[in-house]
Amino acid sequence: MLEREVRANLVYRSFTRIGGGKVPDDTVINKWALALGPEVIEDLHKRVVTIAQDKQIVEGRKMRIDTTVVETNIHYPTDSSLLGDGVRVLTRAMKRIVAIAGNVGAKLRDRSRSVKYRILEIGRAARSQGGAGKEKLQQAYRKLLEATSRVVGQAKRFSLEIASGVKKSSDVFQQAAMEGLRKELDTMAPRVQQVMQQTRARVLGGDTHVDGKLASIFEPGTEIIRKGKASKPTEFGKMVKIQEAENQMIISYEVYEKRPSDSALLVPAIETHQEQLGRVPKLVAADAGFYSASNEKTAQEKGVKRVCIPSRNTKSADRKKEQKKPWFRKGQKWRTGCEGRISVVKRRHGLNRCRDKGDRGMRRWVGLGVIADNLINIGRVLARKDKATAPIVA
């Protein structure tokens, strides 16, 4: 898409310094993006914010903050589908090993078809109601777990035989490919075993709270996050903080390895604001999830004059009166714009779902989306200023 846009647009050609030259292929552009680490993207973002401050687009008098979930690129996780994924990946790797090394050592038995039938059987049993349906479901899961266990055991034997030299190739490049496949088996087999463990606990033991629960064998860092949304009660991805100043400029973003409490993010956000813009904001606005008495006190001690964060459970008449004052309501009205900004970056810049892989890919994806949105907002503000200062022609 980027290649097509740049190729047909003279403004984009000038901006990217391509001019009349050949536009790089989309695969080359993707490789360039992947070569940039998330640390480089963060430095670029800080530079963009500094430019916005130099051009007086952002002053740092106000700050608003919110969190959202950026989903990883996975299908909806069910125990049976995750087990099916594991069998498919392990079997595919073992088939490639056999194609390289031949039929030496442990023989490959392809259980993909039987696993597929078990998954279909689970789907039919899950639609049945009553005790008989539950018993059928458990029986189908037992068969699926047994087949998956045999595939995992086979994958471990293949890995050991490659390491010991039983399965090998005289070709250097083929041997290197086989070593890569062994690493894939060593990575995926423990993940599949973890899925087997959580499946046994949930389906056979009734325990839905298993430590280290996997939502994907391809994106093991995916968190299961429930934010209470009616439209999407459960999301699978990473929690991301979006922090803004004036003119919808995102001055800070952060992807969290583990979901933190919103209230734990407020004070560090004020410190980040001060570090980035060189001043403490006069007004801080956030939703009720960021409120705590200690947060409000610390913010005021740091120099924030107006903390516009409502208290959910207050019974104090003075506090209720404070939250009805015009300045507080105005601050909360401005705060709702953060939700709109998050909606825009999700729709316009792809932050609804990360297409990159891994935690570093998530940080890179979010950072590039934030930079793109900031550049658009900088351009709009500068265009508005130029229009305001342009001489009126009679």
Task: For each feature predicted by the language model, list its residue ranges.
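DNA-recognition alpha helix
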Residues: 2-15
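Anion-binding and metal-coordination hotspots
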Residues: 6, 21-23, 29-394
